[in-house]
């Protein structure tokens, strides 16, 4: 798995890093859109099976030790630290696995393991990195789009 991570990092993520920095994310119709090469990076990590490394197979994961995820994360960070921040959001899956209901696990963990979804809100003016003080609320529209409302 680490060889695969190294291959993706060296041959796709690192060569894309300058273009990602130059283009950057942007707003389009009120939605944040990643740089186009970021989407290439996400697609490459999905195709390589680099999502859900430490999750049980029954949820679509690879059931590898967290140490493997940590090493893979460092390899990706060496190629592009900004992209590593996006890719490593999947580590939030551990909280869902430990504290979510079985219904929540079945609903969300396979999608995260497939690299289809993941999000996190951490910083607000009065919260900083204190997650208990974050005021963000997420609501789902009828069309399935999530709306984030906070400070």
Question: What is the role of each PLM region?
Answer:
Residues 1-83, 103, 107:
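Amphipathic, small/basic residue-rich leader segments at the start of a protein or domain
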Residues 84-102:
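N-terminal glycine-rich flavin-associated loop
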